[in-house]
């Protein structure tokens, strides 16, 4: 157990932050820097792996070969924190749904907080107790997690993303569906053929991403006995930063929209579909991540006047 032990800090290999002086000057903290060949695997109980770390790295292969458990930070949090937990995953919409749940559950009088992949590292909150922690979970987390024992797990959608890491869409689908492994209640998108059948419950998907997100939120609220009508839910509807933000409108009525949070084809397709009866010029860029662009290309052909890459 981590509880009752000395506070610890987590650092990565990027030289963004310097080690704080209280860490450097603490003589009780013993630091050993060794190479992989000098590592005694018999002394290792388990390894906490950053979700961004290369899962094909030699050290990961050696850990597997020696049958050493590899855990994510979210897995450690789930094991150590006694609060009720709601896991939210999907190719897109995770942050919106997580923050909506945080807001609505909090307004009901329960103490809730959204953490995880949305920019709030879970281990910063490991010693806090809430009525509910809503945890945004990425496929990178799921790939290295074996025991996400939560009260509710909801999977919003699955479309092509991160195939440069996961090697194939089939692998990506299996990793996403592993969210449900040990969840007491499992919820999936009824209209997404890539989400496994036989779950506890399903919500109605929609091509309109805002509508699908509200349906997902409504289903989670139902499972924790906080029923809320669609009309009431719409009052809470919002988007996180950089999701379909209108940042300028000129004298001719042309709108300039920042949707830089759309980092995969599925999210971009949803954004295009949400602009009904509009003339669209789309600017795209970034890493392909091994994705299949055929569906996005088809949608651009149907609805966009021009595309700038």
List each language-model region with its residue ranges.
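Nucleotide phosphate-binding/pyrophosphate-handling subdomain across enzymes
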Residues: 210-304
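Short internal beta-strands
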Residues: 8-14, 187-190, 281-285, 303-309
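Residue-level signal for inorganic ion chemistry
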Residues: 2, 47, 70, 88, ...
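Walker A (P-loop) phosphate-binding motif
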Residues: 73-116
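Short beta-strand "acidic-cap" motif of Rossmann-like dinucleotide-binding folds
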Residues: 7-12, 113-114, 134
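Conserved substrate/cofactor phosphate-moiety recognition/catalytic segment
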Residues: 112-129
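N-terminal leader/targeting and accessory segments in enzymes
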Residues: 1-72, 291, 302
């Amino acid at each position: 157990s981590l509880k009752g032990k000395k506070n610890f800090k987590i650092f990565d290999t990027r030289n963004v932050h310097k080690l704080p002086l209280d860490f450097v000057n603490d003589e009780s903290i013993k630091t050993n820097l060794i190479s992989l060949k000098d590592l005694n695997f018999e002394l290792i109980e388990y390894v906490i792996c950053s979700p961004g770390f290369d899962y094909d790295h030699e050290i990961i292969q050696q850990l597997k070969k020696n049958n050493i458990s590899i855990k994510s930070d979210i897995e450690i949090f789930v094991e150590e924190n006694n609060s009720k937990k709601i896991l939210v995953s999907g190719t897109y919409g995770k942050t919106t749904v997580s923050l909506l749940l945080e807001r609505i559950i909090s307004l009901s009088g329960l103490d809730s907080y959204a953490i995880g992949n949305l920019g709030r590292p879970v281990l910063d909150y490991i010693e806090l107790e809430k009525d509910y922690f809503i945890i945004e979970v990425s496929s990178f987390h799921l790939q290295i997690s074996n025991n996400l024992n939560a009260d509710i797990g909801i999977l919003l959608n699955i479309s092509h993303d991160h195939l440069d890491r996961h090697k194939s869409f089939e692998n990506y689908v299996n990793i996403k569906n592993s969210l449900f492994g040990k969840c007491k209640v499992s919820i999936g998108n009824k209209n997404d053929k890539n989400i496994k059948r036989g779950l506890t419950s399903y919500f109605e998907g929609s091509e309109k991403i805002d509508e699908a997100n509200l349906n997902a939120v409504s289903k989670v609220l139902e499972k924790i006995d906080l029923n809320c009508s669609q009309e009431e839910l719409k009052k809470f509807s919002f988007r996180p930063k950089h999701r379909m933000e209108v940042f300028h409108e000129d004298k001719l009525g042309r709108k300039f929209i920042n949707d830089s949070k759309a980092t995969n084809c599925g999210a971009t397709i949803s954004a295009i579909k949400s602009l009904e009866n509009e003339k669209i010029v789309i600017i795209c860029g970034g890493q392909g991540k091994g994705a299949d662009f055929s569906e996005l290309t088809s949608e651009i052909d149907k609805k966009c006047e021009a595309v700038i890459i």
